[in-house]
Amino acid sequence: MRNLLDLSQDELANLLSPKFRAKQIYEWVYKKNARSFDEMTNISKDVRENLKSEFYLDPLTCVRSETSKDGSIKYLFKLTDGKTIESVLLPMKEEISSEDGSVERHARYTICVSSQVGCKMGCSFCLTAKGGFVRNLSAGEIVAQILWIKRENNIPYERRVNVVYMGMGEPLDNLTNVSKAVSILKDNDGLAIGARRQTISTSGLASQIKKLGELDLGVLLAISLHAVTDELRAKLMPINKAYNIAAVMDAVRAFPIDMRKRVMFEYLIMDKVNDNLSDAKALVKLLHGIKAKVNLILFNPHEGSQYQRPSIENVDNFRTYLQSRGVTCTIRQSKGLDISAACGQLKERSKVEM
């Protein structure tokens, strides 16, 4: 049997007659949250029985969830082959001014999804890397994370949702399936999550950044930089030996980005590793001529890590210097730290307690 979520609407239409059935099914699955074909009451019983014999709708089983004191929720999902992945819901608040001048607070959601079971990149600061690489996720397994989390939390279809490919795995090492997931999520008959609400993060696979740009999906790009010299970056991120900083920056400069948006550079700050003012100065030079936003991330500790969280003073000084030189810079508020759901803390669980 096949995972129906792996199919774009066009692919599904090519398998069905009449073709408009594909739109009906898409709307049932993505807009009406149908979890079985039996719920699709405007489709004949014979067609539903045929669909049940060929497809399944839910490739994920939630093994457990943990809720952080900040409201973040981490989910451990089991796939059909027994492998596991983790995803995170990050609820936030945004203020919207109404016509009468009053300010209303609305929930805004970001869903952090995994693109692989494990990861090949071997970054020394990341817990996901400790378990090695197992396999790529299919497009449907990626889409299912968003669909399941939205459904579980009763997030209205029309509510604003952002998707960040920053969970387990290197998204550009699974570019075919990630790009297909982006397109499925964009479908207006599906979840209708626009490309500008989807951010793909990469450790710096320069050749794949180029391929992603050629696909012209309209997604936002985030670069996990974390160091300003090749020597240090190669120690932190072995991928730098294949694609050094210069190669990554060349790929970024060639990447098509919306005029209203910026390329995000993620910079994980670690105590006495990359947190001094000389690093900040070198970063400003490195980003010269690029419409960039720097996201400073305080290292999130995990068992067995050789790194430590930096002092708030050093982080503030780092940010202040970047801003004084005209670089847009924010300090990411790490959500889910108390449930190991923050950056670099997700991992595959080979033995799951059911």
UniProtKB/Swiss-Prot annotation:
It is found in: Cytoplasm. The keyword 4Fe-4S applies. Belongs to the radical SAM superfamily. RlmN family. InterPro entries: Aldolase_TIM (IPR013785), Methyltransferase_A (IPR040072), RlmN_N (IPR048641), RNA_MTrfase_RlmN (IPR027492), rRNA_lsu_MTrfase_RlmN/Cfr (IPR004383), rSAM (IPR007197). [4Fe-4S] cluster binds at C119, C123, C126. Residues 105-338 form the Radical SAM core domain. This is Dual-specificity RNA methyltransferase RlmN. Binds 1 [4Fe-4S] cluster. The cluster is coordinated with 3 cysteines and an exchangeable S-adenosyl-L-methionine. The gene is rlmN. The lineage of its organism: Bacteria, Pseudomonadati, Campylobacterota, Epsilonproteobacteria, Campylobacterales. GO terms for cellular component: cytoplasm. The active site is at E86 (proton acceptor), C343 (s-methylcysteine intermediate). S-adenosyl-L-methionine binds at G169, E170, S201, S224, L225, H226, N300. It comes from Campylobacter fetus subsp. fetus (strain 82-40). Coiled coil: none annotated. Reaction proceeds by a ping-pong mechanism involving intermediate methylation of a conserved cysteine residue. Its EC number is 2.1.1.192. One of its GO terms (molecular function) is rRNA (adenine(2503)-C2-)-methyltransferase activity. Its main location: cytoplasm. One of its GO terms (biological process) is tRNA methylation. CDD domains: Radical_SAM (cd01335).
